[in-house]
């Protein structure tokens, strides 16, 4: 079968975001073509899934297949950010630790089984646009470069061609063809420029051996505050072990070991700074190379436009501390499917549908960015009680938002509690070691734009975030008013997703009727 000359919806990229979007849209009877530049199975890091994946897979009838595959069940995880404190999430609800080459291929094949025409080894090189004739203003996380109408592709066997389409889903990963080549709107978070090294081990000591939490993921902050380490047990008998640290501190560490220091040596030094993980690995054997990759966090000023949607890493990426990447990819893919189908069905205008998608993606990024910033700051400060009250020696409250109940819908109060916690953390940082300039805390009156911490107000929180992590102007809005209030936390049911109204539109998650309702 060859790539067709035209389709209704072109999905560029066959990773989790693209495959999920293609499956959801094809199941609605749409003519969908999915093009993946690589060949499955292909390696990818990012093995630890959140419980929110299960209801998302359930919606496209894929949960049972994932469950039957034999992936390591993830009943929870522990986060030890300082030398004294340990927090966890679970055990209500579960997810999996996956081998991404296997899980990504399952998703890709499911898109084909759902009715999408799926091709591998096909790369999108360029996109053609034409003017969009209807009113479509820039702003509010959307952009109008024109309407994409066709794409030029090439294959690994040397063939090439063009494919025309009515809608485009950009799921091209960090390449992000729309953001980087056409919109040129990707912005890096200067405070979250990290570098990761990782490898795979066998014969380690399971974490929490002999307890109900045995062999669950474990994350530990380095004692020098440079970053954090992970251990994620996999069903193939290996354990994924890695370290994430600020890029400048990584090279400082490498320099201290000598100019010829290898990543294996650097990993060994990181394990010394994560003593619990170091003990777990004492009898273990490294069975892979130590890999390295930049781990820069970024976002964009727009995630949609006339007849196109941007999903997953093609739009935004955050430090992987809370397994955010895969969740944002799949949740964003569902948002793309909902909004495109709504546009096709005439539930609303294309401008309204695309703006809904863009804001939905931005909200997910916002929630994770807020908590990741607070967690990383705790790691860097170590003994200062940023993520726990002075009289509390645990992080359970901090990670409550990662503990979905099987049938519980998150309320405004639930989300507000999470936000209040993060605001409390940021304000503690100010009390500990920050001198906030007056001009950074001027702005909205307390309480006007949402939840406050009781005395400082949202504008001060925005200033704290800007000072704390050198946020871009766009990212300062993350804490400016805390507009997440009433939006869905990453939870255990699709009610969290479906029950959220944006600009008077709510998602309608019914097979055969996927779209948006006006409320």
UniProtKB/Swiss-Prot annotation:
User: Which residues does the annotation say bind FAD?
Assistant: 14, 17, 47
Under which pathway is this protein filed? Secondary metabolite biosynthesis
Pfam families from the entry? Trp_halogenase
Q: Which GO terms describe its biological process?
A: secondary metabolite biosynthetic process
Instruction: Identify the Gene3D superfamilies for this entry.
Output: FAD/NAD(P)-binding domain (3.50.50.60)
Keywords in UniProt for this one? FAD, Flavoprotein, Monooxygenase, Oxidoreductase, Signal
GO molecular function term, any single one: monooxygenase activity
Task: Give the signal peptide range.
Answer: 1-21
Q: Which domain of life is it from?
A: Eukaryota
The entry marks the following residues as binding chloride, namely: 324-325
Q: Which SUPFAM superfamilies match?
A: FAD/NAD(P)-binding domain
Quote the biotech use from the record.
Radicicol is an important pharmacophore as an inhibitor of heat shock protein 90 (Hsp90), an ATP-dependent chaperone involved in the post-translational maturation and stabilization of over one hundred proteins, and which activity has been implicated in diverse pathologies ranging from oncology to neurodegenerative and infectious diseases.
Look up the EC number in the record and give it: 1.14.14.-
What is the documented function of this protein? Flavin-dependent halogenase; part of the gene cluster that mediates the biosynthesis of radicicol, a resorcylic acid lactone (RAL) that irreversibly inhibits the HSP90 molecular chaperone, an important target for cancer chemotherapy. Within the cluster, rdc2 is involved in the chlorination of the resorcylic acid lactone (RAL) structure to convert monocillin I into radicicol. Also chlorinates monocillin II to produce 6-cholomonocillin II and monocilllin IV to produce 13-chloromonocillin IV.
Question: Member of which family?
Answer: Belongs to the flavin-dependent halogenase family.
Name of the protein:
Flavin-dependent halogenase rdc2
Organism of provenance: Metacordyceps chlamydosporia (Nematophagous fungus)
Q: Which gene encodes it?
A: rdc2
